[in-house]
């Protein structure tokens, strides 16, 4: 029997937790990564070189690689504030940017680095061009730019993307559409709902591919609410927003953590974008999705509350075996 095909969609921080564990399973992995980041080092390089931002892709490359820890530290090394124009840039971002310039696109750079790091899965930016994320708030106000959205004091109604450097309609990478249509399972998240997951899904070709695919669509719900994005959200609210943007109820299965996060891990100065634990609305989830898997997926580490990648992947593998029957 062929290995199941699984496509994981999101941002570099959230889905890396899942990919680190998933890479050890007998599964054909494709990671689809957002290109809407406009903050920090990624934003600076994107603006200076008009390329797709490298930061999220860098994190996914490392998550899917089994390179020695020292090489990983080298790739993640961030230059000091005293280092002039290099200040704040991770070395890996500069490497991706350099190869992108040599090879004509970030897409090409990632394919080269995937081979260089002997990664067996596939990694694709959701679009081959940098995209700008726009958020329309319920009061009618609109904010452009991922890094600016959370700063506006309002509730987001919906988001959309535009090409950053031309007026053409945003287009998905062709390989991304193929992966979605050929997958047995699509995994969304975990990660920032409006600024990491949805920037991929609102690209027209990706939205349409998700409508057409026969794959099981799984959403890994966030454990904590996020400042400026999902304040006071329940888990069912997260799913409702996804279905709203996809234009129909496409989420088949939701994975939800039900382990309690200790109070000491909330409103942490170290992770100040996260607020409180997401409320569990089981009845709402059952209305929004076909299947709900509630379990203890929590991992407490370095003062933060995260998903336990091994436990999540165990459930994903059990589920994909069922849907392939």
From Swiss-Prot:
Q: Where in the cell is it found?
A: Cytoplasm
Q: Where are the transmembrane segments?
A: none
**Superkingdom assignment:** Bacteria
Keyword list (alphabetical) reads:
Cytoplasm
Per the record, the similarity remark reads: Belongs to the gluconeogenesis factor family.
Keyword Cytoplasm present in the record's keywords: the answer is: yes
Q: What is its main location?
A: cytoplasm
Query: What is the protein's given name?
Result: Putative gluconeogenesis factor
State the species of origin. Streptococcus pyogenes serotype M1
**What terms describe the molecular function in GO for this protein?**
LPPG:FO 2-phospho-L-lactate transferase activity
One GO biological process from the UniProt record?
regulation of cell shape
- What is any one of the record's Gene Ontology cellular component terms? cytoplasm
Q: Where is the signal peptide?
A: none
Family matches, as InterPro entries: CofD (IPR002882), CofD-like_dom_sf (IPR038136), Gluconeogen_factor (IPR010119)
């Amino acid at each position: 029997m062929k290995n199941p095909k699984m496509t994981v969609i999101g941002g570099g921080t959230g889905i890396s937790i899942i990919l680190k564990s998933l890479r050890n399973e007998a599964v054909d992995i494709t990671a689809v990564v957002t290109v809407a980041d406009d903050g920090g080092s990624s934003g600076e390089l994107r603006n200076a070189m008009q390329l797709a931002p490298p930061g999220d892709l860098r994190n996914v490359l490392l998550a899917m690689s089994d390179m020695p820890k020292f090489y990983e530290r080298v790739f993640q090394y961030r230059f000091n504030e005293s280092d002039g124009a290099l200040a704040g840039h991770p070395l890996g971002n500069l490497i991706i940017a350099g190869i992108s310039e040599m090879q004509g696109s970030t897409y090409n750079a990632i394919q080269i680095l995937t081979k260089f790091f002997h990664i067996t899965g596939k990694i694709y930016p959701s679009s081959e061009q940098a995209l700008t994320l726009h958020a329309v708030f319920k009061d009618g106000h609109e904010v452009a730019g991922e890094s600016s959205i959370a700063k506006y004091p309002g509730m987001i109604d919906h988001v959309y993307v535009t090409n950053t450097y031309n007026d053409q309609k945003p287009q998905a990478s062709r390989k991304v559409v193929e992966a979605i249509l050929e997958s047995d399972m699509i995994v969304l998240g975990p990660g920032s709902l409006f600024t990491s997951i949805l920037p991929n899904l609102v690209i027209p070709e990706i939205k349409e591919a998700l409508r057409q695919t026969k794959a099981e669509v799984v959403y890994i719900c966030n454990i904590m609410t996020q400042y400026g994005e999902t304040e006071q959200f329940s888990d069912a609210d997260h799913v409702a927003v996804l279905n709203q943007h996809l234009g129909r109820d496409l989420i088949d299965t939701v994975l939800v953590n039900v382990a309690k996060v200790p109070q000491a891990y909330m409103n942490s100065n170290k992770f100040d974008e996260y607020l409180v634990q997401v409320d569990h609305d089981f009845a709402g989830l059952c209305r929004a999705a076909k299947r709900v898997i509630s379990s203890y997926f929590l991992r407490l580490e370095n003062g933060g509350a995260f998903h336990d990648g091994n436990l999540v992947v165990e459930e994903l593998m059990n589920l994909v075996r069922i849907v392939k029957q």
